[in-house]
Structure formats: structure tokens, C-alpha cells
């Protein structure tokens, strides 16, 4: 049986990249659960095109404090932890809408790469981080990779990020602000 992988994606006003971000994951056999953090652009409408085609659900995920909507990264990460305990998948990926993930093996898509890692007995996967910056307005006909062509160095401490984990009731994304998924020893 195929290893089932779910990317839990968070987004806020990502209309310019959301279609391609979701599409790239689905094309690599990774399902997507979208947490929309109160977008005011077309992010949700664009994402909804993928419902039941690899996109499991779009959940409005906003937080309030004293009656006002606030951005709460910790609460968002806790929601991702909850979802990974509730959803019926073998592996989970914490991803933002402006991130692109590929398998390191050219002949394997992302799901197949994760399946191989699973067969090797691992329960976490790290990714090397490369920051590409948008230096001009992305045109509608440009892909993310065509538009983001300028690289900026990543801080030494932040180059490797562990954002993929095998299903566990004890996942911890909060302790390292989502950059290092932790499982108990």
C-alpha cells in the first residue's frame, strides 16, 4: 500500500503563489490541507479549485485577542499539530504557501521519496533551506521558480529545517517555531 502524505499548508494573502504551490504538491502525490489565516485576497477562491482533487479542506484559521483578529504563529503551529493527530495519513509536512518541496531523488516524486525514507526506518526528514527573493512583480504567466531568481544566504543556524514527520501523537512544532519538528526519543 502507498504511503499517504499530507502537507498542512498555511497561507495569508498568497493569491500570487497558492495555485502553483498546491498544484506542485498534488502532482507529487501529496495531499494538502490548507489553513487560511484570514486572507483578504483571492487565496481561498483559487485554492478551492483543488477541493476533492488533492486538496482535502480549506479551513479558516484566525485567532482573536480582546475581540480583534491577531496573527498567532504559535496557535497556528498547535493547530497543525492537532491536525496531524486527527487526519488519517502516514506522514505530514509543515509547509507555507511560498515554499516548494521536491524529493532529492530525481527519479522519485516527493511522496515516493518520503516512502523510501519510511522504508529505511526514519521518522523525520530534514530539508536544506534556500531563500529566493522576489525582486520584481511576478507576472501571471511566470512560475514561482521563474519569478524568484535572486538567492540570499540563509543564517547558519537556519539552513536545515525538519518539517516532515511520521504520524505521531507527540509531535512538537512549537518549541522551535516550526523550523524543527520534534518527536520524543
Placement of each model-derived feature along the sequence:
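N-proximal low-complexity "stem/linker" segments adjacent to membrane-targeting elements
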Residues: 1-23
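Acidic/polar residues in short coil/turn loops that connect beta-strands
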Residues: 41-42
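Catalytic-site signature of metal-activated, phosphate-bearing donor transferases
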Residues: 72-78, 103-185
Amino acid at each position: 500500500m502507498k504511503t499517504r502524505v499530507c502537507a498542512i499548508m498555511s497561507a495569508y494573502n498568497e493569491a500570487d503563489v497558492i495555485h502553483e504551490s498546491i498544484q506542485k504538491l498534488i502532482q507529487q502525490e501529496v495531499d494538502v490541507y490548507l489553513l487560511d489565516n484570514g486572507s483578504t485576497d483571492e487565496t481561498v477562491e483559487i485554492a478551492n479549485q483543488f477541493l476533492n482533487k488533492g486538496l482535502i479542506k480549506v479551513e479558516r484559521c484566525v485567532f482573536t485577542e480582546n475581540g480583534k483578529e491577531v496573527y498567532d504563529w504559535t496557535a497556528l503551529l498547535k493547530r497543525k499539530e492537532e491536525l496531524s493527530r486527527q487526519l488519517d495519513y502516514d506522514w505530514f509536512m509543515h509547509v507555507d504557501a511560498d515554499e516548494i518541496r521536491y524529493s532529492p531523488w530525481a527519479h522519485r516524486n516527493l511522496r515516493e521519496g518520503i516512502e523510501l525514507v519510511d522504508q529505511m526506518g526514519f521518522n523525520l526528514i530534514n530539508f536544506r533551506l534556500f531563500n529566493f527573493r522576489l525582486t520584481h512583480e511576478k507576472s501571471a504567466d511566470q512560475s514561482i521558480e521563474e519569478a524568484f531568481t535572486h538567492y540570499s544566504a540563509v543564517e547558519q543556524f537556519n539552513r536545515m529545517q525538519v518539517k516532515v514527520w511520521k504520524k505521531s501523537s507527540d509531535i512538537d512544532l512549537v518549541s522551535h517555531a516550526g523550523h524543527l519538528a520534534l518527536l520524543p526519543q
